[in-house]
């Protein structure tokens, strides 16, 4: 069987860890959200299940009616993803939810249809209205607690903390200049400022003694004589000291003891005092006790409420319910598992499952946070402030969580409606059932809005496989709940030490989004809390083990991590006593005995696209950024070619992007053609798997998707083998460009400013030819004036224009079209107007039809030409208008379909029976199997499975079987689940086919009778003005296509294919391109492909050795001869092979001209831009140029009749038609606009006509 070609490398040893699935971030998250394939009772409390459990049960206001959620059930998709794209519909499944309603009449259960939910394709994308979209993961500030510091204008450092919940009110505490702590709620600083002591009391710590006990250690001291005074004076009391008989107070908790106070206490025979250790009068808690206006729980509650809601009556009940609602009601305040995890970790609380499930705030949290804040103030070395840009404080919301939040808001909206309906329902006249009070609109409209309009749901970049892959791995800090592009500062955008191995430091867009949109590093994963983890090898006693530990940024802080390039011996021990390592974000030379972990691979630092750049370590970071971004813009070429110099990631990137077809199981190839491959399974040759290819489909960006088989009949395939190549892949490897023989030299000035000179030979060989596919759509609707009609019979159009249209008015496949050609003929009824008498007479003589329609045909727009490659027609069938012949044909068709459906079901049942037999026959039952509804024991523990028992199990559905977890039954459950899903899918497909035969395309929008889609393919050859680039950020525009005979040539007569400017290298500092040139030349001559992975590539010495081995010049420079004169150039020139890409900025899409066109409404000046059919702006500096030449008439013409002189425009048009040559300019509209603006300011400005 075909295998990806081996690449030669100088890498000492392979990575011990394979890359994870590169689109796992998308697939895993959405799978967890929907939990497809799990039984209702087995579902975990996450995703959609969690939302339903949170919102339900819903009770009516009088609590007489209760609506409970039981479970949800997802259907199977009606169409395949490809069919959804073809029809322009959403790839989704139905959502049905089972509810139980309890009211005065009894208990009723019902399954309610709740609309449809879009589901993810195997490639990690969604299909919404026929377009593939990606939901980008969002990086946001993690819920939890953050400690910060800021400098006051007086120079004091003020410490503060914020408790940020997942949902609910923020709680902030900050020191003021007097060392008092104030609490702010919801960031409204001025109005909601509450003394921390008041807030502590409002939480339930009523007495001063309770509060002191929370913050200080208490010690009992004896007071026996005046000798004890010296020890006690200046100490702080921890409890009130009073005479119980007379209730006389000698000292209050929090007071400082003086000699006088102690004398009074001694006189009153008080012998023991409780003292707060480490407390003094300057301690923030003691200061706040003195400052606090309240002295009890009730007073504190009322004071809290007064400050929170000034103007409202502060009753105890109101105050208590407000504080409960703000922080202790799980429906309104939720820290989430993440927030609780962060808070417990920071404050040193337990990390067990029970503690992490506490989602609301606790009193202990506030006390713990205040203690930590005071420790910071006191200068405790173990207390530290948080860096908000550290990845320990930023987390990722993946697609599942983003959609879960949308579902939550949709169901919360529905909850209100359900309550209202419960209250308004008239029980006397009707019976209440769940379906009558549940409205699915809330949920479906929210999902529709999210997928269609959200900033994070994006039209997938599908220029090439890498663009697609990167889009799914993208991280965005923008979007709802994220940052704002205008307000995001430098710190947020900057590379942080904690990004190592988690976020790529190179790949980010240039421009306003720099640093806000990033990409996941190659080995990174996202854990259950949403934090990015990266793998490390564990080091024990100086030995680097093969054990892998995935670590989050905060855990990594405590580890000393060696680089992957550290030298090891054959026993995996460090050979050197010191090595480069990282600790707390700093790099230093560490003693190898202190190292705890080691990097898995040098490429774990960078993202996939950056990892595709050979010799990345020799490129300047700014150019590497451009190189990463430009690989995503490379257009798939007609003839693909893998790079001679790669990095070893090409095959993996192609595989995980979904561009190529990969074998899903072992087997033998039985049949191959251009459209499909059939593989017979190895374990059972009667089971055959068909792999269908995508043929000439249009991608989102208009490029062509086409898959070609790589195997032959009789080939043995193994799971994971490449069966077919896709767009921009070659032999299963990514192939974005071409290996081109280049020379770095100036050539007649044509490569000035990074321009590129190419040989005509590349054009002749179709080296950079790409195929673009345009889709044109036309719909015929049922209008108020009558039905539109798709027809060949179009008024006032000659027969030769209609030559390529078929009988039905649709262009034939294979027709060559150019701008203005008709693709689909359509006539539309005209609105009836009052007719002149002679017209009415003509109508009476020649019949009604001819005049009351207008031509509304679909024509080819300017700038597009090519070949019609496909036509798709969708239409509804009218049951009543079918002829008898059509009805007979339909019946035959339906009969055949039913027969095929029954055959498929019997094949499926046979397969299922065989698999059951293979698993169970003659095996002992490890545990009893019980029928869930009847509680009958179907299989007794220890029973040996025979044919009869297996047949009994075959009749049951998975929902009805209760099986204890064990290996055998887990496999049985999966078998049953797959079988039931396949049955369901067969049934849905059968019903869809029946519906299609009877009703046509019922999915068409309301009012549409017929819809036609025409696909026009055009070949784009490389031409002057196209943008080209290498992988090192070396970009340029084709400036000249030179005949092969005129290009410089080598001594052996071989002509150079492309000439680059040598001045593009030194200042750009991307030497990677020069090393690639040399290594490419040596490898091409040797006839091999090489891989030079990031940071462990070919050393320079090895490249020179290879050059000498192949008989090439040792310095990589050769003499060239001028193709025009045949003379040798004076100096030697660097020549070699570089992998060059053609980017999607093609001149054909940009070139544009206008004679007349639309004008702006206000200024009456021509619009700008190709899309608006606009003109070129003749700006201020251009006017100066004409003024300098003194061309008065041309200047007047440009500023008036060619721009915004409305009457002059019309006159000049007339004079051109009449053949006259006169220019009479009028008043430009801009003058009128100026006058109106001045009048708008209240100035009475009027133009005056003055006689000369």
UniProtKB/Swiss-Prot annotation:
InterPro entries: DNA-dir_RNA_pol_bsu_ext_1_sf (IPR042107), DNA-dir_RNA_pol_bsu_external_1 (IPR019462), DNA-dir_RNA_pol_su2 (IPR015712), DNA-dir_RNAP_su2_dom (IPR007120), DNA-dir_RNAP_su2_hyb_sf (IPR037033), RNA_pol_bsu_bac (IPR010243), RNA_pol_bsu_CS (IPR007121), RNA_pol_bsu_protrusion (IPR007644). PROSITE patterns: RNA_POL_BETA. SUPFAM superfamilies: beta and beta-prime subunits of DNA dependent RNA-polymerase (SSF64484). GO terms for cellular component: DNA-directed RNA polymerase complex. It catalyses: RNA(n) + a ribonucleoside 5'-triphosphate = RNA(n+1) + diphosphate. One of its GO terms (molecular function) is DNA binding. The keyword Disulfide bond does not apply. Keywords: DNA-directed RNA polymerase, Nucleotidyltransferase, Transcription, Transferase. GO terms for biological process: DNA-templated transcription. Its EC number is 2.7.7.6. The RNAP catalytic core consists of 2 alpha, 1 beta, 1 beta' and 1 omega subunit. When a sigma factor is associated with the core the holoenzyme is formed, which can initiate transcription. DNA-dependent RNA polymerase catalyzes the transcription of DNA into RNA using the four ribonucleoside triphosphates as substrates. Belongs to the RNA polymerase beta chain family. This is DNA-directed RNA polymerase subunit beta.
